[in-house]
Amino acid sequence: MNVAIIGAGINGLMSALELSEQGIQVHIYDQQQAGLEASWAGGGILSPMYPWRYPQAVNTLAKHAKYLYHQWNEKLFPITGIDFQIQQTGMLIFDHNDFAQGLAYAEKYNEPMQRCEKISQSKIKNINPRVSKNLQEAIFFPELSNIRNPRVLQSVIRYLQKQPNVQFHENIKISNLIPNKDEVHAIQDHNQNIYFHDHIVIATGAWSAEWSKQLNIQLPVYPIQGQMALFKTPPHWLPTMCMNKVMYLIPRQDGHIVCGSSMKDIGFNKDTCNDTQKNILAACFEMIPELQKFPLIKAWTGLRPSSPHGIPYIGQLPHLKNVWLNTGHFRNGLCMGAASAQLLRQHMLSQPLIEDPTPYSPNQLYI
């Protein structure tokens, strides 16, 4: 089997990893270098933010993915020398309006990753002494982890580059799908070069709607811009992740702290905005006032692939027997990525599935 994967973000790369490990010949195409865009830009929380606000289909993939990332890191790190830097820092959430829902969710699903308790200021101080004294209560999720997105991407790319059955085609924009009855028998790039493959996987994230006309479906995936900021503190200065009013702080092992994130529906605009950055910083300083003492290293944006309810499309297109989707992960592309790729691989190779595929089925695009 020879598979073309269009898109080299986390979902395209993890799909390539899953398929290539089964001995399949994989070709990865991207309009720029592999591992950029939203996959690189995200914060790397290994759980949906406020999981009770999401459909359970999203949380299910996130649950599987957390364990898969640990397994992949154990396999790839000795070969690539790049550690994913998975940290179980836990998270403090300060949104009072979410306390009851969060506690009820944890009790209902009884997942270790989502175990939580409501705590008062004295315990908050013991867990994270950097938190503002104005925040009197929180719910604490001790099992929540984060992962360093760029390092995951670098490790996976380096590993795949070493595999004889994987080939990267970077800076090549695939612009056309060439149909033949009930399948796509070739793809064409912007320079009119044609490539023949047995199967096609579309993993183009925020750009996925561009395929709607050629696929004769309406693929409702479009970009939502998110802005981030990065501070540098001493290592281990901030002991936990923190979140309030959809803004978060994520500590890295080396003392960098990722702050985010905004949501703007402004197309493919990737410019940062001073007002948005001010809002992000104000929200983060409200949680951790001492952060203001440290240097702001940089700010950036990413384009999330928004989809209805944030549930990705994973599976085969019914009217094109060799075209598959793995896209539309919205804010949880990396969070769900490892499990999404595993589910896709199981689909493509007719293997037992980790979960009921119905919520992710492209069949719903035809209703």
Model-derived features: where do they sit?
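N-terminal Rossmann-like FAD-binding beta1-loop-alpha1 element of flavoenzymes
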Residues: 2-27
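Short hydrophobic core segments
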Residues: 4-6, 195-207, 341
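Residue-level detector of alpha-helix initiation sites
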Residues: 5, 9-10, 33, 206, ...
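Active-site substrate-recognition segment that forms the wall
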Residues: 14-22, 31, 44-46, 82-87, ...
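Dinucleotide-binding Rossmann-like beta1-alpha1 core, especially the glycine-rich loop
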Residues: 45-127, 283-285
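Helix-loop-beta segment of a Rossmann-like dinucleotide-binding subdomain
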Residues: 81-93, 105-108, 115-163, 262-266, ...
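Helical element adjacent to the flavin cofactor pocket in flavoenzyme catalytic cores
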Residues: 139-191, 195, 199
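C-terminal catalytic lobe of FAD-dependent flavoproteins
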Residues: 288-290, 294-367
